[in-house]
UniProtKB/Swiss-Prot annotation:
Segments on the Lumenal side according to the record's topology features: 190-194, 270-290, 524-526
Location in the cell: Endoplasmic reticulum membrane
Binding locations of Ca(2+): D463, D465, N467, D469, E474
Taxonomy of the source species: Eukaryota, Fungi, Dikarya, Ascomycota, Pezizomycotina
Annotated Polar residues bias: 855-876
Source organism: Emericella nidulans (strain FGSC A4 / ATCC 38163 / CBS 112.46 / NRRL 194 / M139)
Protein name: Mechanosensitive ion channel protein A
All copies of domain EF-hand, residue ranges: 450-485
Reaction catalysed by this enzyme: Ca(2+)(in) = Ca(2+)(out)
Cytoplasmic face of the membrane: 1-168, 216-248, 312-502, 548-944
Length: 944
């Protein structure tokens, strides 16, 4: 290493006279670790060095002023970079594992494999996509066991998971063959045999009709969505909705068509094939026909009830959640594009670093490096093959498949937790913030989107305060809000589906009652009198059911008609709730048909009946816009209007400097004058958001209240008790008939006439209470700014936030984005149970893979005696081997991203020690042995 010709001299620190630092207003302030230069003082000459020698004097001739200091946001992002990258890699691993698991099942030809079914669902369906379906989906009637133990159960499970053609053929043929036995007996062996006066042959034919009509109706109902879609496309723009309705009504339509066919075929088949040739209807035929009619009426009412239930679910979904779902999907799509751009950009940086490191390699490392590259290429090729196979399987199943490296899977995985949302936000901030700036501007996002309009829409999504830039804290808050909104929509729609299910159960009960009444009316003529007497008895007991019926109707109206809140909303319930009985604030945790669960700010869970909530006023914070708050300040009587105006101007200056938090407007209102003793002044300030996020509200309110306190202290506005006797700081007692004390001054008293004239003594009537402009109390220096430094900073346009000594949010700035109090979703999902199930599932998969590999290895050893070539027996084994071999290369790339400066810092430290002459010969030799010798290095060029 050569020493440069022109060395930069070390900074010189001239000796200064030590003196105590003055607390006067002329001394500059220190904000954090930054020295605020006072431009009001001289800076050059010996006099300056002698007079102001208490300040550190540094020669800044060779200082690089273009390099800006790191902002707190950038410093926090740099400190969290390692954890963020590890979290992103974990999310990518989870997304890739779930995707490749589905693809492996698709490539093996068995989507519902037994191995996968034991661990998790065959398809990892996103809860958000599953919940945002506007229809009310009925659960499957039969769910096969996950681990069938007998051969019959395994056969039934395979049949149930096969195609509908195989299933229908398997279900239809056995019973058809059984019913064919009496048909053949009546046709061939006993032609004169009869059942109830009907020929055995035709009675068996009718039984075949009953069985085959069921499956014919099933097939017609399954094919019904296609013509419904075509017909609806002629009259509406949303034909998919009606097609999905037809899919959900498949079972009710099947039952309706089945019993329609049974009713149509029963009497003609029976009456026209009597043994005696008489076509008169028999008694049992009339009775059975009435039963069939009753069941047919039930199927009609059931079809109408299911159709109305779907209409209720769709209309409620469209009216309440459609806009929120569309906005959240756009937000997640924008985050996906931003993350994809970020990943590509960081990958390019890593590849450039890897290429730079490759230049120094030689010898035996070169083949290993190329082998690692080959493994990486093979791994990428297999990933592409898996993606193609997944796309083919998706084409057959009609589902949309994403590749294993699709950014949307990673973004969704990160949005599931608050920490993941913050990690994603810091990752995006790291990518898009420009060097030397603390915020992201609209032009920084244009590279990640296709057009400027989409980029502007995405920027407005993050720029909640509409000030033209995005800070890292704001980005974190928006990402947490997007993830929280996604979980809120999912939870709300799940609760809605549960409510619709319970409402459907109630409707089914009424349908069954109506069907029973119809059956009793048809089966007997005397049933009318029985029903009349039963109705009278029910009316006599109406007092017993009236309260329940009223509560049910009020709950239905509250949930489906009014619906004042959703899951996750912060609401204020007015009424007899709360500790004081005047109402309280809650977060909605769960909505049911008859009750709603709330979470208090303290964490308590409260349950309230919907019938009671139906009669109360409900304030919804999430549905509210930007809010204002009035802070009452009680000041002493006699405070001048100039002081009040100065207070308003000082607060206006504050809110204009904090545009990210507040609107630039302050209102003042004199509410009351109390007995010429005190004045109540209302100070109204405006937030830029609502109070849904309690942490953010506390942060902003603390900032404003602290600033209000400081402004009152600086201006000299005092409380009403300063008008009381003995309230002065200088003379804390009252003497009757003695003149009031002189006003305290910041500087020494000045007497221009040499002390010949005594100071002015006010008359007896000129009391301090009549001089509101003066304050007898001692004004302490502000914690915010001091004297000329504030004036100079204000003249330069420096924001107030840059001159703070303390955190005005009182610690709420760091927890505002978490919104711990408003998180009602962690308790809904049993995290411990899901984690245990996931670990058990992974353990099963590992055990099965190990067992399969042991079987394959033993098979290879047995075949090794016949051949010397060992070929992997399956694609999965080859894939597993390449995965295990490529893990080291992937981990090295990740390790290079985290620890790329370690060796460089070590060599730099050795070089610094050598230049300072503090390194020993051994250290120098070791450092020289470690550092590579550049081609341009010559020992003779070193200058001592």
């Amino acid at each position: 290493m050569t020493t440069p010709v022109n060395e930069v001299p070390e900074p010189s620190y001239p000796a200064a006279e030590r003196r105590r630092r003055s607390d006067s207003d002329s001394s500059p302030t220190v904000d954090g670790n930054a020295y605020v230069h006072d431009e009001s003082q001289p800076h050059d000459g010996a006099y300056a060095g002698a007079q102001y020698g208490s300040h550190l004097q540094v020669d800044t001739t060779f200082q690089d002023f273009d390099k800006t200091s790191r902002s707190p946001s950038a410093a926090r992002e740099q400190a969290m970079r390692l954890e963020d990258d590890l979290a992103v890699l974990e999310a990518e691993r989870v997304a890739s594992r779930s995707t490749h698991g589905t693809e492996k099942d698709a490539r093996s030809g068995d989507v519902h494999s037994l191995t996968r079914s034991r661990s998790r669902r065959a398809e990892d369906v996103d809860e958000f996509d599953e919940a945002t379906n506007p229809l009310h989906e009925k659960a499957a009637v039969y769910n096969p066991p996950e681990n069938p133990s007998t051969g019959v159960s395994k056969f039934i499970k395979r049949v149930h998971e096969s195609s509908f053609i195989v299933r229908y053929f398997t279900y239809i043929v056995p019973l058809v063959l059984i019913l064919l036995i009496p048909l053949l007996v009546g046709a061939l062996a006993y032609p004169d045999a009869s059942v109830g006066g009907v020929e055995l042959l035709w009675f068996s034919v009718w039984l075949e009709i009953v069985w085959l009509t069921l499956w014919a109706g099933r097939i017609v109902a399954k094919l019904l969505p296609t013509p419904v879609n075509i017909f609806a496309s002629i009259f509406t723009n949303n034909s998919k909705k009606w097609r999905d309705v037809a899919k959900q009504l498949e079972l009710p339509v099947t039952l309706f068509l089945w019993w329609l066919g049974v009713e149509i075929s029963f009497l003609p088949t029976m009456k026209n094939h009597h043994v005696d040739g008489n076509s008169r209807t028999r008694d049992w035929e009339n009775t059975l026909n009435k039963i069939i009619i009753s069941v047919f009426v039930w199927t009609i009412l059931n079809l109408i009830e299911k159709f109305l239930l779907q209409l209720i679910a769709m209309s409620f979904h469209r009216r309440t959640y459609s806009d929120r779902i569309e906005i959240n999907k756009f937000q997640i799509g924008s985050l996906t594009k931003l993350y994809a751009f970020s990943r590509n950009k960081i990958a390019e940086t890593d590849e450039a670093f890897e290429e730079k490191q490759d230049k120094s390699g030689s010898g035996a490392k070169t083949p290993l490096r190329y082998a690692g590259k080959a493994r990486g290429l093979a791994l990428g090729a297999l990933n592409k093959v898996g993606d193609v196979a997944g796309a083919v399987a998706a084409d057959f199943t009609g589902r949309k498949a994403n590749s294993s490296s699709h950014p949307s899977q990673v973004v969704i995985a990160l949005l599931r937790t608050t920490a993941g949302c913050q990690t994603l936000a810091r990752r995006l901030y790291r990518t898009f913030v420009r060097e030397g700036f603390d915020t992201v501007f609209p032009g920084d996002l244009k590279e990640a989107f296709d057009d400027n309009e989409e980029a502007e829409a995405a920027f407005s999504m993050f720029d909640k305060d509409m000030n033209g830039d995005i800070s890292m804290e704001e980005l974190e808050a928006v990402c947490v809000e997007i993830g929280r909104e996604r979980k809120a929509i999912t939870a709300s729609l799940k609760d809605l589906d549960s409510v619709v299910s319970r409402l459907g159960n109630v409707f089914e009960f009424f349908v069954a009652v109506i069907a029973i009444i119809v059956f009793l009316t048809l089966i007997s003529t005397s049933a009318a009198g029985v029903l009349t007497s039963a109705g009278s008895s029910i009316l006599a007991l109406s007092w017993l059911f009236s309260a329940t019926a009223q509560e049910f109707l009020q709950s239905v109206v509250f949930v489906f008609v009014k619906h004042p809140f959703d899951v996750g909303d912060r609401v204020t319930i007015y009424g007899n709730s709360g500790e004081a009985g005047l109402g309280d604030d809650y977060y909605v945790k769960q909505i049911s048909l008859l009750y709603t669960e709330f979470k208090k700010m303290q964490g308590h869970i409260v349950q309230a009946p919907n019938s009671y909530l139906n009669t109360l006023f409900v304030l919804n914070q999430r549905r509210s816009g930007a809010l204002a708050e009035a802070v009452p300040v009680v000041i002493k009587y006699g405070t001048t209007l100039e002081q009040m105006d100065a207070l308003r101007q000082r607060l206006l200056e504050f809110v204009r400097s904090e545009r990210r938090e507040f609107q630039t407007n302050i209102l003042t209102e004199l509410r009351a004058v109390t007995e010429n003793f005190s004045v109540t002044l209302n100070v109204v300030f405006f937030y830029k958001s609502n109070w849904q996020n309690e942490g953010l509200r506390l942060q902003r309110r603390n900032k404003f209240i602290c600033m209000l306190m400081v402004a009152l202290q600086e201006i000299g506005i005092e409380g009403p008790r300063m008008n009381l006797q003995g309230a002065s700081v200088d003379i804390p007692y009252h003497i009757a008939g003695f003149p009031p004390p002189y006003q305290a001054r910041d500087g020494p008293p000045v007497n221009d006439d040499g002390g010949q004239h005594p100071p002015h003594t006010p008359s007896s009537g000129d009391d301090q209470h009549h001089q509101p402009g003066h304050s007898p109390s001692y004004r302490r220096p502000s914690i915010l700014r001091k004297g000329m430094v504030a004036a100079n900073a204000r003249a330069r346009g420096v924001s107030i936030s840059s001159r703070k000594h303390v955190d005005f949010s009182l610690g709420m700035r760091d927890v505002a984005s978490n919104d711990i109090m408003g998180d009602v979703f962690e308790a809904r999902s049993p995290a411990a149970d899901s984690a245990v199930r996931q670990v058990i599932a992974e353990r099963r998969i590992q055990e099965e893979e190990a067992e399969r590999q042991s079987v394959e290895s033993s098979r290879q050893r047995n075949s090794g005696s016949r051949t010397n070539l060992t070929v992997p027996t399956s694609t999965n084994e080859a894939r597993h081997s390449i995965d295990s071999q490529g893990a080291s290369s992937l981990s090295s790339i990740s390790r290079n991203r985290f620890f790329r400066h370690r060796s460089h810092s070590h060599s730099t430290r050795q070089e610094d020690l050598m230049e300072q002459g503090r390194s020993s010969e051994q250290g120098s030799s070791s450092a020289a042995a470690i550092r590579p010798i550049s081609p341009s290095y010559h020992p003779d060029e070193k200058k001592l």
